[in-house]
Structures are given as C-alpha cells and as structure tokens.
C-alpha cells in the first residue's frame, strides 16, 4: 500500500513529489522442507518527472528512497524422512535510485504504446541472523549488497476520461538483469551457539538474472485523488506480485 503526493506544473508531464508505502512479501521456497519467510518493508522517497516535448510523449523520471524492513523466517529442512524446523527474525535497511525514460506512441484516442528503458540502483544491508528456536539452528553474518539492474520493456496502455474522472489500464512486459553483488553476496553461516567454522551459503532467495516480468495495472483518479491496483508475475522464481496504492495531487 502506498501514498503519493504529487505537485504538477503548468507544463504537461512535469511534476515533483514524494511517496511513502508499506510492502508485505510472503516467500515460499522450493526446498525439500517448503521453508517460508514473511517480509514487511516501509519506504519513503521523492521523485521528479521531466518532459522533453510539449505533449509529454518523451519523458524522464528519477526517484530515490530509503527503506527499512522486518523479516520472520521459518526454515524447514529434511533429514532422512523427518522434517525439522528453525525460526529467526532479522532487519534490513538501505536506499535506492530509479531512472526511467519512456516514449509514448498514440495508437488511437484511448490506446497508446509505451516502450521504456531504465536503470535501478540499490544498496542494502541485513542484520545478523541467529535462529532462536528449533533443531540445528544456524547463525548468518550480517552482510550488505549492491544491486545494478538495467531493464527494458513496453506497455500497452488505455485511458478513458469521463468528466473529471480518468480510468487507466495498462499491460506490460519487461526484461531485467541483475549485474550487482546480489547474486554473489558471499554470505557466511555456521551452526549457532557453537564455535564451529563459518562456511559459504550457496544461492540467493531472489534471483533477477535474466528475469521476464509481466504486469497489469488499473487506476482511477478525479484529478485530485486516485487509487491504483496492480498484479504481476516474474519468470525467475515464479513469483506472483500484487498491491494497492493511493494518490493525492496538489
């Protein structure tokens, strides 16, 4: 869920604003024990949108935000024929910058085709993870990561106005590739509450190397307030996403 405060100028497509939101993610891992994790993350940030022509067909948008997250993990693992578990809690925090440039081609009165390209940068860190309950508890060292994620895609958008009300619907597909430290973060773990040696953890919870994502967005506004809803799918990890947002324009 998100709140967006936007100040528009007399020039079409030129605006500046800030936003705040809360995101909840529920992860289900494809391991033998079907481990799970719940993530709750809060964000606050600013954005600026700049048009390069009079009708805003070519537009550049940049945004930056800071975030903090609270995570609960239920790790389940199989030993012979029995499933054991261990639970932990940890925190995340960081900051990110997003750049996107888009070009809109009008197909008819209501439909438009919008190809776009972007570059997303993010630095984050997670706290030490020490499982408090369960069998074979693990301890993971605190670590940081740096994400460099270029993206290219296109949207098919529809807009219909009736009075002061606007209805917007878009379907999009995009390709993104992770080039940063996320896919090779060198995380270290050991058996908790012992003097055992540290070892390297293999793999990542979220893999965005060569991901194709699709999105459906539906929005309504009356030029003062608005609401949006979206649902999406990622081929990497077979993730399903969804969210609701609120918007206020001054």
Predicted regions and their residues:
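Membrane-active amphipathic alpha-helices enriched in small hydrophobic residues
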Residues: 3-5, 48, 117-121, 216
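Solvent-exposed, glycine/polar-rich loop segments of beta-barrel outer-membrane systems
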Residues: 30-37, 72-91, 125-146, 179-208
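Short glycine-rich beta-strand segments
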Residues: 19-25, 65-75, 116-128, 174-180
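Outer membrane beta-barrel transmembrane domains
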Residues: 42-43, 140-250
């Amino acid at each position: 869920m998100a709140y967006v405060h936007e100040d528009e100028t007399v020039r079409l497509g030129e605006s500046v604003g800030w936003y705040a939101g809360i995101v909840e993610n529920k992860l289900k891992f494809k391991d033998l024990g079907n481990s799970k994790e719940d993530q709750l993350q809060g964000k606050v940030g600013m954005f600026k949108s700049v048009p390069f022509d009079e009708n805003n067909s070519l537009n550049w948008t940049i945004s930056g935000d800071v975030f903090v997250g609270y995570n609960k993990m239920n790790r389940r693992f199989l030993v012979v024929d029995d499933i054991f578990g261990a639970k932990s809690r940890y925190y995340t925090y960081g900051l990110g910058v997003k750049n996107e440039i888009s070009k809109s081609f009008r197909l008819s009165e209501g439909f438009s085709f919008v190809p776009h390209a972007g570059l997303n940068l993010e630095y984050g860190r997670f706290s030490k993870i020490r499982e408090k309950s369960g069998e074979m508890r693990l301890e993971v060292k605190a670590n940081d990561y740096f994400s460099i994620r270029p993206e290219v895609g296109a949207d098919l958008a529809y807009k219909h106005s009736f009075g002061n009300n606007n209805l917007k619907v878009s379907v999009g597909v995009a390709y993104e590739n992770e080039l940063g430290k996320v896919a090779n973060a060198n995380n270290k773990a050991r058996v908790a509450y012992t003097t055992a040696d540290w070892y390297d953890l293999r793999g990542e919870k979220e893999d965005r190397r060569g991901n194709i994502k699709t999105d459906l967005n539906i929005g309504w506004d009356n030029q003062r307030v608005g609401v949006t809803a979206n649902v999406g799918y990622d081929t990497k990890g077979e993730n399903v996403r969804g969210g609701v947002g609120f918007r206020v324009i001054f």
